[in-house]
Amino acid sequence: MNSKLKSIYLGQAIGDALGLATEFMSKEEITIHYPNGIKDYNDIYQDEHRSRWSKGSWTDDTDQFLCIDRSIKKYGHISTLDIAQEFKNWFNDNPMGIGKTTYEILKLPRKKIFHIRNLLIIY
């Protein structure tokens, strides 16, 4: 892997792990919990949501990035069908932190997901 590509992967994972610090917080909550900013993983406020992850762990955002990456490496181009299958495989492993909308779509049977996809393409 070349250094630029490696930097993209590291930036995604590190940024995601640090971004967990403010995920789902309002501006007011961020000001209260991080008056001096966030300098490292030890600064991350541990509430019910954030304490589910080990310090420095990435979230479902990076997991989904890696699903897309695997698909592109496999086919050499973007295949929405394969990316959907990668997401479904990832979902079947019961990932932590999955968003409500993503969860609601991925819990559907494969046939229904592709029906929705086809409707979106048509309209």
Walk through the language-model features, giving the residues of each.
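Structured, active/binding-site neighborhoods that engage oxygen-rich ligands
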Residues: 1-123
